[in-house]
Amino acid sequence: NVLLIDGTGAAAQPGQTVIVQNGVITEVGPVKKVKVPAGALTVDGTGRTLMPGMIGMHDHMYYSAAGGRSAQMSYTGPRLYLGAGVTTIRTTGSQSPYGDINLKRRIDQGMVPGPRIYVTTPYLTGPGGGGTMSVAETPEQARRFVAYWAEEGASWIKFYTNISREAMGAAIDEAHKQGMKATGHLCSVTFREAVDLHIDDLAHGGMTA
């Protein structure tokens, strides 16, 4: 008897029954028309809303605090995402990439609760930018960076403001060869240049190049 938002853009539908078997939705319809299988575990949805899990496309597993400090949230982070209805996230830039990768593995193995995670590499920038971020001075360094993190389990790479066009192009090419995708918080490379280099996604569009 739940209010159902099905994610298609259709109006919310009250008084719906949703049947789930072995983790798969097998039937959806009005309470009076859908027969609940004998012995099924039931949840009374009266006064509740059911909708598909949301997908977060720009998320982090760390929390920035005053004074330039930050804290990794490997325990609370995934639980907070689930609590907000977010069942898939992309960590768009990581300060603790191994922490994110290991967390993803634990979630995938059912050891801890959390959303499906697409892990992004550490931020990749150019000389003179990004503080403790990884720096690629040459296209070859950029390729090696991507190949390394692909092997470690990252599925996206994120560029930061000082990356050069040449290093970025090489990294995107290598990422696509490795089955990865690329995004960027850009400045030294314009959005048009990034598109010409076949970047997959652009971050912070309203505040960068």
Kindly give the residue locations of the regions a language model identified.
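Short, flexible helix-adjacent loops and helix caps
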Residues: 7-9, 66-69
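Histidine-rich, glycine-flanked metal-binding segment
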Residues: 4, 8-51
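Divalent-metal coordination cores built from histidine and acidic residues
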Residues: 45-64, 70-186, 190-209
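Residues that scaffold the ATP/ADP-binding catalytic core of kinase and kinase-like folds
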Residues: 28, 64-65
